[in-house]
């Protein structure tokens, strides 16, 4: 969600024929680079890496092989960036209509649609080839599935049609967990699927908390996010239910992955904090609190911290287990 400075007006058609592949000739090199970085949505990628790195530690039962880990992170970043860039191409009309996203490069015409697609497709091809050559076929296949699911299922099929868009569309955001595990073990087991479900159930309340803050944006863009089409009470009830599912599923990793006590204790403590905040907001809604008085962004930031710290515990646990042996 990088914000770029507003450039002088440019001729889109001229930009499309630019030798730089889609950025106006008048654009500086710095603006050119920043625009393409912004297309990748770095903050979204950061979140994906938060889940990829820890699962490799669990899969390796300690520190993963450095070469495989670095390759997975590099090509995983490229894979996510490709999907995000193509998403920017498809959703450029929505981005122009929303205050939160109207400074994205495609919305501001810093990068042309043609340049955006070339960038996205190139990254998709390079990431897939990189996974095949430097990691393994299973990780490559999962990466391709994640890109295709995000573009065709979430962006094209679900986002503009259903209030459950982020529920099922969130599957793409869960894939780095499986990719990280497959990169190390060349197979899939129950443990990564538990962490997959943690991210799956975590995504809707996290996203809806943000959408409640920007519901007018989504309404203006005709995106039927749950906070746009449902009451605050309904939204917060679902946030509570999905938060409970997140916490319960997170505890299943303890017996399935045979962790030390560090992980379940951390998961329980973090879960109590997450649930307390979700219930607090729900109770406020039931008491009639609404609008700006309902501090949903606090829950949004807390849920970010919850997931990050949970996966820190996932990372540390196998290291502790090795130290105790």
Swiss-Prot record:
It is found in: Cell membrane. It is an enzyme of class 2 (transferase). One of its GO terms (molecular function) is protoheme IX farnesyltransferase activity. InterPro entries: Protohaem_IX_farnesylTrfase, UbiA_prenyltransferase, UbiA_sf. It holds the Pfam family UbiA. It comes from the Bacteria. GO terms for biological process: heme O biosynthetic process. The chain crosses the membrane at residues 44-63, 68-90, 115-135, 138-158, 166-186, 190-210, 235-255, 256-276, 296-316. The keyword Protein biosynthesis does not apply. The keyword Transport does not apply. Residues 1-23 are annotated as: Disordered. It is a multi-pass membrane protein. It catalyses: heme b + (2E,6E)-farnesyl diphosphate + H2O = Fe(II)-heme o + diphosphate. Keywords: Cell membrane, Heme biosynthesis, Membrane, Transferase, Transmembrane, Transmembrane helix. Carbon 2 of the heme B porphyrin ring is defined according to the Fischer nomenclature. HAMAP family: CyoE_CtaB (MF_00154). This is Protoheme IX farnesyltransferase. It comes from Thermobifida fusca (strain YX). The lineage of its organism: Bacteria, Bacillati, Actinomycetota, Actinomycetes, Streptosporangiales.
């Amino acid at each position: 969600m990088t914000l770029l400075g507003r450039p002088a007006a440019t001729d889109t058609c001229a930009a499309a024929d630019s030798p730089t592949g889609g950025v106006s000739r008048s654009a500086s090199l710095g603006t050119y680079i920043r625009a393409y970085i912004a297309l990748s949505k770095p903050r979204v990628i950061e979140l994906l890496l938060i889940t990829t790195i820890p699962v490799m530690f669990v899969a390796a039962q300690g520190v993963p092989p450095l070469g495989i880990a670095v390759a997975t992170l590099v090509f995983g970043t490229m894979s996510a960036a490709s999907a995000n860039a193509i998403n920017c191409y498809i959703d450029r009309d929505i981005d122009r209509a929303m205050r939160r996203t109207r400074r994205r490069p495609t919305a501001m015409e810093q990068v042309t649609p043609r340049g955006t697609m070339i960038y996205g497709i190139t990254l998709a091809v390079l990431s897939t080839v990189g996974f095949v050559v430097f990691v393994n076929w299973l990780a490559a296949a999962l990466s391709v599935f994640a890109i295709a699911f995000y573009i065709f299922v979430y962006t094209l099929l679900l986002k503009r049609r259903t209030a459950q868009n982020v529920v099922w569309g969130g599957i793409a955001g869960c894939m780095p967990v499986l990719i990280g595990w497959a990169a190390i073990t060349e197979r899939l087991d129950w443990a990564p699927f538990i962490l997959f479900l943690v991210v799956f159930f975590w995504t809707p309340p996290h996203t809806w908390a943000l959408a409640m803050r920007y519901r007018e944006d989504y309404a203006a863009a005709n995106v039927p996010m749950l906070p746009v089409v449902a009451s605050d009470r309904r939204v917060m009830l679902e946030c509570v239910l999905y938060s409970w599912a997140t916490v319960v599923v997170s505890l299943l990793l303890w017996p399935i992955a045979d962790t030390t006590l560090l992980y379940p204790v951390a998961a329980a403590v973090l879960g109590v904090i997450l649930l307390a905040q979700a219930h607090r907001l729900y109770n406020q809604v039931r008491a009639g609190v609404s609008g700006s008085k309902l501090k949903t962004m606090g829950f949004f930031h807390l849920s970010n911290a919850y997931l990050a710290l949970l996966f820190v515990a996932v990372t540390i646990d196998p290291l502790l287990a090795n130290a105790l042996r």
